[in-house]
Amino acid sequence: MATRRRTAIAEALTRLLPRVPYLDAEAIRAAAGARHMRDLSTGAAVWLAALAHIRHAHTDYDELRDEGYERDEARYFVLDDTNRTLERWGSVRRLQSVEDDDPAEADRIDP
C-alpha cells in the first residue's frame, strides 16, 4: 500500500473513531488498505472496514449467520451492538439501517 494512502487511512480513522482501541485500529487500517478497497475514497474505505470489523469481532453476527440467518437479517439484529461500539469509540456517525453499510453508498460516507 502506498505511503500516502496509508497515511490518509490513519488520518481518516482518527477522525472517524478517535477512541478506537489500538488492536482494533490495526485491523481496520489493514482492511481499509486492502486491494478491493482501492477504488473507494479513504473515508469510505475506513468506514466500511470499521463496520465489518465491529460486526465480526464485537457482535454476534457470525453466530447468527452460523444459525442460518441471512446476511441482512443478521446485520439487523446486531445493529444496536454495532452502534454502541461506534459510540464507545467516539464516532458521531451511527447506522440507521443495514443499508447504511452498503458498498454502493460508501463514497458518500466520507467523514
Predicted regions and their residues:
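Structure-specific DNA junction-binding interface
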Residues: 1-111
